[in-house]
Amino acid sequence: METNEQTMPTKYDPAAVEKDRYDFWLKGKFFEAGSDQTKEPYSVVIPPPNVTGRLHLGHAWDTTLQDIVTRMKRMQGYDVLWLPGMDHAGIATQAKVEAKLREEGKSRYDLGREKFLEETWKWKEEYADFIRSQWAKLGLGLDYSRERFTLDEGLSKAVREVFVKLYEKGLIYRGEYIINWDPATKTALSDIEVIYKDVQGAFYHMSYPLADGSGSIEIATTRPETMLGDTAVAVHPEDERYKHLIGKTVILPIVNREIPIVGDDYVDMEFGSGAVKITPAHDPNDFELGNRHNLERILVMNEDGTMNENALQYQGMDRFECRKKLVKDLQEAGVLFKIEDHMHSVGHSERSGAVVEPYLSTQWFVRMQPLADAAIELQKKEEKVNFVPDRFEKTYLHWMENIRDWCISRQLWWGHRIPAWYHKETGELYVGLEAPEDSENWEQDTDVLDTWFSSALWPFSTMGWPDVTAEDFKRYYPTDVLVTGYDIIFFWVSRMIFQGIEFTGERPFKDVLIHGLIRDEQGRKMSKSLGNGVDPMDVIDKYGADSLRYFLATGSSPGQDLRFSYEKVESTWNFANKIWNASRFALMNMDGMTYDELDLSGEKSVADKWILTRLNETIEHVTQLADRYEFGEVGRHLYNFIWDDFCDWYIEMAKLPLYGEDEAAKKTTRSILAYVLDQTMRLLHPFMPFLTEEIWQHLPHQGESITVSQWPAVVPEHTDTEAAADMKLLVELIRSVRNIRSEVNTPMSKQVELYIKTSTDEIASRLEANRSYVERFTNPSVLKIGTDIEAVDKAMTAVVSGAEVILPLEGLINIDEEIARLQKEFDKLTKEVERVQKKLGNEGFMKKAPAHVIDEEREKEKDYVAKRDAVQKRMAELKG
């Protein structure tokens, strides 16, 4: 293909570059897996976003990392499957749809289950389209022909299969347990759906009289309304204050029920009075203790948070209204003797905002211990799941070793209905893949499964399981890497691992790449309440997808949080702009060169040899680091190579042959420009897919798209260590001359005398061989190079590798005026040094000042001393 620089506008405009490019990739089917079965498969499943609204910055970060991995692997010759999909997100989606209905003055009960689900499916379709449009704006290389949804029939079949098999193995059971209960939505919540907030509450100190009249025992609670369901008081069996009371009973105030005093190691003797009220139906720890002591479970609340018949005269009251009335009654009864202010962390429903109630409920549970044991055992084997960074394996194992049974039922309508039926007459329970044959005599359980239940099957249910003969399952499972945040290692990663082991006999993914959370510039978590959230689509509209992607990918190391910064996104835009301008310059000077005319065999300059050597080094570093998921380091290497080596040095040096008369040198330089730019665009492509595709399409190339071009490989014959050493010396020398010019305020346009005294004849000959570069970039009126250069009075000098750079100042500046100016600066800096040192020597200041203020003063001292010494050195040089 012939190049044409006129098709590359002068100005880099991300919107114009990105327009229609995604459609080009989709039409080319570049992201569809399976077209070449001879290639080694590589698979990734996207963590499915909830169909509840817009994707946030965390999604953009997570998916950008996956896109980088899959684009690179595709270019490395793998048959890549990156499977997209979305999660039905039970309670989150149902809450959104119910809120929409409320605006219309309706409730889900007005519609009925079937009609409500129809409305929810409409919501899903609308937001699924929206999410796909956001994926497109980010440039994600997803195989849409395999897109999945957690409520698809195929995935629903997998869910039923897993439920039934676990039930048949005795690993799913129905029983009473304390769960997180949302009284507003009237459903159980998973731990991740509970948000903890600091709330100003109180400790209510009460005395429970001993039944034998011999005294009383003091307890304290933050939830006095639950005392109506107390069935014991617990003390530590070794507590000398209470040992003698174990086995006795107390009278529960107001209720007048006799309850036992029990001894249990759970009680902390040092906390409060050392005696604890036990309410097995309203506290998870009390529930466990109650099981150990065979205590009665008395539920005192209804599902909506009002008090039930067990609450006696408080029946029908809201729980908080009951608290106020009960506290008043306890005070009047003389048993509540102190109310102490207490700030404590209280769980709130993420969806409704209601205070979550620990609540005894009959639910479906997964018996976790056998599944967790298998997952722990896997980590002792060679075929274990590799956590990146590996410190998260400890986090994962800690959770698995301290596992509790998993409550999987939810009192919702949107989700996978539990495949259990109850006989209308006998109450008999039937669990199966389908309803019993005489279905008219049976009623299906109205609950649905926890969203995480279906999400846990995502890596294999999306591949066709339970059909183990499905082509995708056989070819792409287990997957290669899962990319996710550390906040859901327990809720999702751990569950995928144990379900994968249980139902496929294998780990569901080989690696888990863990990233942190996105925070604002102050390090705060982004939230609606703080108003510090950032919409990734707004960032794309302003800076383009490539700038956002590059910032997200290179802004932190694995496992670390990332602070979002518009300033840093703007700097990545500047980087993209630099690439655009350099590419445009190169294309303007290629003179219509075609791919077949590329020729790297001609005689090369030291700059040519050096840039090819640096390209080899960059290819090696980038490939190795990307394979280790160290994208921050990849970004550093790419930035240094592109900005410093290619743009600032090679392109400037290439102007010598390009603007010269030697046609052979011109041809070689053009070929090297085209080749290096091509290879660099390929290295950068996974990070900045739109920009690199645009530039690559203008370069001489073969193939339809950079997306399916070959990943760069090191070419050993392109490495020239001598040329690299020569170039290193040249760069060091040129920089030192520029620095001296800057120090004495002499612009590059003004010629200077330049003497380079070398330590050996060999270094002198190397510099002589590259004299044209020294002249081009230092603009000397006189240039002398050799070992026999004599010292010059009143000159500025700099030492570089194997040589001394000397710039005589006579005639360049007015030396007397410069010395006078420097003396004033020296005096000023000396005063600053004395002032800071006096402050740091002040005992009072050192004792009272915060550590960061002292550190700032020490930094100032170092800075002033360094500047003063530099000025003193310059004066000495000028005085000769």
Swiss-Prot record:
Presence of the UniProt keyword Oxidoreductase in the record: no
N-terminal signal peptide: none
Record EC number: 6.1.1.9
Subcellular localization, as worded in the UniProt entry: Cytoplasm
Pfam families in alphabetical order: Anticodon_1, tRNA-synt_1, Val_tRNA-synt_C
SUPFAM superfamilies referenced in this protein's UniProt entry, alphabetically: Anticodon-binding domain of a subclass of class I aminoacyl-tRNA synthetases (SSF47323), Nucleotidylyl transferase (SSF52374), tRNA-binding arm (SSF46589), ValRS/IleRS/LeuRS editing domain (SSF50677)
Inducers of expression: By valine starvation. Is transcribed by itself and in an operon with folC. A GUC triplet (Val, the specifier codon) 190 nucleotides upstream of the initiator codon confers induction upon valaine starvation; replacing it with ACC (Thr) confers induction upon threonine starvation, replacing it with UAA (stop), renders the gene uninducible. Negatively regulates its own transcription; this depends on the presence of the GUC specifier codon.
Motif ('HIGH' region): 49-59
Principal cellular location given in the protein's record: cytoplasm
Domain of life: Bacteria
Disruption phenotype: Cells lacking this gene grow normally, suggesting there is a second functional gene with valine-tRNA synthetase activity in B.subtilis.
GO biological process: valyl-tRNA aminoacylation
Motif ('KMSKS' region): 525-529
Assigned GO CC terms: cytosol
Keyword annotations: Aminoacyl-tRNA synthetase, ATP-binding, Coiled coil, Cytoplasm, Ligase, Nucleotide-binding, Protein biosynthesis, Repressor
Catalysed reactions, semicolon-separated: tRNA(Val) + L-valine + ATP = L-valyl-tRNA(Val) + AMP + diphosphate
This protein's record includes keyword Nucleotide-binding: yes
Record-listed ATP binding positions: K528
Its job: As ValRS can inadvertently accommodate and process structurally similar amino acids such as threonine, to avoid such errors, it has a 'posttransfer' editing activity that hydrolyzes mischarged Thr-tRNA(Val) in a tRNA-dependent manner. Catalyzes the attachment of valine to tRNA(Val).
Quaternary data: Monomer.
Family affiliation: Belongs to the class-I aminoacyl-tRNA synthetase family. ValS type 1 subfamily.
Record remark on domains: ValRS has two distinct active sites: one for aminoacylation and one for editing. The misactivated threonine is translocated from the active site to the editing site.
Protein name: Valine--tRNA ligase
Native species: Bacillus subtilis (strain 168)
Gene that produces this protein: valS
